[in-house]
């Protein structure tokens, strides 16, 4: 079990709860979430505008460290720092080839991972992690000296 912020109904007060994690599949990567952002689409899900499935764990944009990989996973290992993308880019369209997978025209969008969660320790199918073009630096501005 892990702790997660859970919203149980539209406009309900978020609560910290312990939730069960599904078993790790052979093509999954389990990530220990270091941080997750709550963006406008999360707020729209929380207030019911986007009609998500409740209960919901908001925060579908996250970064963390790979904790465990499934047997069929290659290219990732425990300890790898990763940024989780909210959608699986095709890596073949014009935008993906240009290094802009967030604009993918064939994207398989997800509000988050299965069950609407990105709780700490959630297993993410490796297809959602194939685009490693974004590092931590893509989410931070350069500090002035």
Regions found by a protein language model. Name each.
Residues 11-16, 40-41:
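Short N-terminal binding/cap micro-motifs at the start of the first secondary-structure element
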Residues 15, 27, 60, 141-143:
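Short, basic and Ser/Thr-rich N-terminal targeting/leader segments
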Residues 13, 90-145:
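NAD(P)H dinucleotide-binding glycine-rich loop of Rossmann-like/cofactor-binding domains
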Residues 7-10, 22-24, 57, 138:
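Sterically constrained small-residue positions within well-ordered secondary structures
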Residues 18-20:
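Generic structural detector for well-ordered beta-strands
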Residues 22-36, 46-97, 102, 110-112:
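Glycine-rich beta-strand-centered segment in the early N-terminal region that forms part
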Residues 1-5:
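Short structural boundary motif marking the start of a folded domain
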């Amino acid at each position: 079990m892990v702790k997660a912020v859970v919203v149980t109904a539209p406009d309900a007060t978020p609560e910290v709860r312990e939730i069960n994690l599904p078993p790790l599949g052979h093509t999954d990567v389990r990530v220990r979430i270091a941080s997750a952002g709550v963006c406008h689409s999360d707020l729209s899900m929380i207030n019911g505008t986007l009609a998500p499935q409740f209960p919901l764990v908001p925060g579908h944009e996250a970064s963390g460290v790979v904790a465990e990989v499934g047997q069929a996973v290659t290219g990732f290992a425990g300890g790898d720092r990763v940024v989780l993308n909210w959608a699986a880019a095709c890596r073949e369209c014009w935008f993906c080839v240009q290094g802009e997978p967030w604009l993918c025209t064939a994207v398989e969008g997800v509000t988050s991972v299965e069950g609407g969660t990105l709780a700490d320790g959630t297993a993410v199918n490796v297809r959602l992690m194939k685009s490693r073009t974004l590092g931590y630096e893509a989410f931070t501005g350069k500090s002035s000296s």
